[in-house]
Amino acid sequence: MAPNLRKSHPLLKMINNSLIDLPTPSNISAWWNFGSLLGICLMTQILTGLLLAMHYTADTTLAFSSVAHTCRNVQYGWLIRNLHANGASFFFICIYLHIGRGFYYGSYLYKETWNTGIILLLTLMATAFVGYVLPWGQMSFWGATVITNLFSAIPYIGQTLVEWAWGGFSVDNPTLTRFFALHFLLPFAIAGLTLIHLTFLHESGSNNPLGIVSNCDKIPFHPYFTLKDILGFALMVLPLTSLALFSPNLLGDPENFTPANPLVTPPHIKPEWYFLFAYAILRSIPNKLGGVLALAASVLVLFLSPFLHKAKQRTMTFRPLSQLLFWILVTNLFILTWVGSQPVEHPFIIIGQLASITYFTILLILFPIIGTLENKMLNF
């Protein structure tokens, strides 16, 4: 009998073991679809980004008009730009849901997979930030100024670090040029990290909604989950194209339709919606260094999840108290996102401070306590 090329060819063998004959738990739900959706997001962003880069000029005098030119004069340039800008939003929606899934079902106990995932999140955040600066509108310029300025809070080396990042004494042409270089490079770094993420995942195999070992009941990835993933793609592409075609500027800031002007500060400087929760935590501390540390901690706290897991059960499927706490955390993140978009005045300041305290309290204190309590309840 002739050997099966899919199983014998050195390259096809890798693809086969990762995407075709991969043993997969039979009971994973739609929450396990977001990994493949993130892959599609990444490919879409790289493709549209490449097409945009062909028409973009990384120069302060030309950047804004080159983007306008792309939208006006390039064949379907408006569509490519709208898909790229809104694709970023969908990327973040998918990654937040993916992390939420991992948190709910205890997937963080696969430490290597979880840690590479957090590094992926940080890289994605960096990519989105430098990308937002490229159109060189008002919010691009002032967002870059405010966020890069945060590094000056680092003791002793802060100011030097900021001027080194800027390539001068303010955000100017060198800053834009290097941000374009970084925005081009980082998505490929994300693609490389994704392969590492998947390598670690395939070492252990997928988790499942019950959180129990599922070796006795696994099915091949293809055709079952390839088909399921295609349904997922369709359900994501539909709202993405609808948003890009019907209301492409819904999630953007009107301030960015004005070319960057260092002499005029916008009344409310705020990042894109997907950074608002972290921005609210940053603003809730009246001290610069304290705010920067809280901002960093808001994401880096995820690294501690595996060590704060005290429950005997892996997932929250049969842990109602932890479930309640989880959904309070989700609501709290929505409150932080909303507060981050509001001006710094009463009552938003105190709401932001309370929500920030709640965020860290739930993650660092309440989850371990409730987990231990539920262990005790198992004995009754």
Swiss-Prot record:
<feature type="transmembrane region" description="Helical">
    <location>
        <begin position="34"/>
        <end position="54"/>
    </location>
</feature>
<feature type="binding site" description="axial binding residue">
    <location>
        <position position="183"/>
    </location>
    <ligand>
        <name>heme b b562</name>
    </ligand>
</feature>
<comment type="similarity">
    <text>Belongs to the cytochrome b family.</text>
</comment>
<keyword id="KW-0349">Heme</keyword>
<dbReference type="InterPro" id="IPR027387">
    <property type="entry name" value="Cytb/b6-like_sf"/>
</dbReference>
<dbReference type="InterPro" id="IPR048259">
    <property type="entry name" value="Cytochrome_b_N_euk/bac"/>
</dbReference>
<feature type="transmembrane region" description="Helical">
    <location>
        <begin position="179"/>
        <end position="199"/>
    </location>
</feature>
<dbReference type="Pfam" id="PF00032">
    <property type="entry name" value="Cytochrom_B_C"/>
</dbReference>
<dbReference type="InterPro" id="IPR036150">
    <property type="entry name" value="Cyt_b/b6_C_sf"/>
</dbReference>
<comment type="subunit">
    <text>The cytochrome bc1 complex contains 11 subunits: 3 respiratory subunits (MT-CYB, CYC1 and UQCRFS1), 2 core proteins (UQCRC1 and UQCRC2) and 6 low-molecular weight proteins (UQCRH/QCR6, UQCRB/QCR7, UQCRQ/QCR8, UQCR10/QCR9, UQCR11/QCR10 and a cleavage product of UQCRFS1). This cytochrome bc1 complex then forms a dimer.</text>
</comment>
<keyword id="KW-0830">Ubiquinone</keyword>
<feature type="binding site" description="axial binding residue">
    <location>
        <position position="84"/>
    </location>
    <ligand>
        <name>heme b b562</name>
    </ligand>
</feature>
<feature type="binding site" description="axial binding residue">
    <location>
        <position position="197"/>
    </location>
    <ligand>
        <name>heme b b566</name>
    </ligand>
</feature>
<dbReference type="Pfam" id="PF00033">
    <property type="entry name" value="Cytochrome_B"/>
</dbReference>
<dbReference type="InterPro" id="IPR048260">
    <property type="entry name" value="Cytochrome_b_C_euk/bac"/>
</dbReference>
<dbReference type="GO" id="GO:0045275">
    <property type="term" value="C:respiratory chain complex III"/>
</dbReference>
<keyword id="KW-0812">Transmembrane</keyword>
<keyword id="KW-0479">Metal-binding</keyword>
<keyword id="KW-0408">Iron</keyword>
<dbReference type="InterPro" id="IPR030689">
    <property type="entry name" value="Cytochrome_b"/>
</dbReference>
<keyword id="KW-0999">Mitochondrion inner membrane</keyword>
<keyword id="KW-0813">Transport</keyword>
<dbReference type="GO" id="GO:0008121">
    <property type="term" value="F:ubiquinol-cytochrome-c reductase activity"/>
</dbReference>
<feature type="binding site">
    <location>
        <position position="202"/>
    </location>
    <ligand>
        <name>a ubiquinone</name>
    </ligand>
</feature>
<dbReference type="GO" id="GO:0006122">
    <property type="term" value="P:mitochondrial electron transport, ubiquinol to cytochrome c"/>
</dbReference>
<feature type="transmembrane region" description="Helical">
    <location>
        <begin position="321"/>
        <end position="341"/>
    </location>
</feature>
<keyword id="KW-1133">Transmembrane helix</keyword>
<feature type="transmembrane region" description="Helical">
    <location>
        <begin position="114"/>
        <end position="134"/>
    </location>
</feature>
<protein>
    <recommendedName>
        <fullName>Cytochrome b</fullName>
    </recommendedName>
</protein>
<feature type="binding site" description="axial binding residue">
    <location>
        <position position="98"/>
    </location>
    <ligand>
        <name>heme b b566</name>
    </ligand>
</feature>
<dbReference type="GO" id="GO:0046872">
    <property type="term" value="F:metal ion binding"/>
</dbReference>
<dbReference type="InterPro" id="IPR016174">
    <property type="entry name" value="Di-haem_cyt_TM"/>
</dbReference>
<feature type="transmembrane region" description="Helical">
    <location>
        <begin position="348"/>
        <end position="368"/>
    </location>
</feature>
<keyword id="KW-0496">Mitochondrion</keyword>
<feature type="transmembrane region" description="Helical">
    <location>
        <begin position="227"/>
        <end position="247"/>
    </location>
</feature>
<dbReference type="InterPro" id="IPR005798">
    <property type="entry name" value="Cyt_b/b6_C"/>
</dbReference>
<keyword id="KW-0679">Respiratory chain</keyword>
<dbReference type="InterPro" id="IPR005797">
    <property type="entry name" value="Cyt_b/b6_N"/>
</dbReference>
<dbReference type="GO" id="GO:0005743">
    <property type="term" value="C:mitochondrial inner membrane"/>
</dbReference>
<keyword id="KW-0472">Membrane</keyword>
<feature type="transmembrane region" description="Helical">
    <location>
        <begin position="78"/>
        <end position="99"/>
    </location>
</feature>
<feature type="transmembrane region" description="Helical">
    <location>
        <begin position="289"/>
        <end position="309"/>
    </location>
</feature>
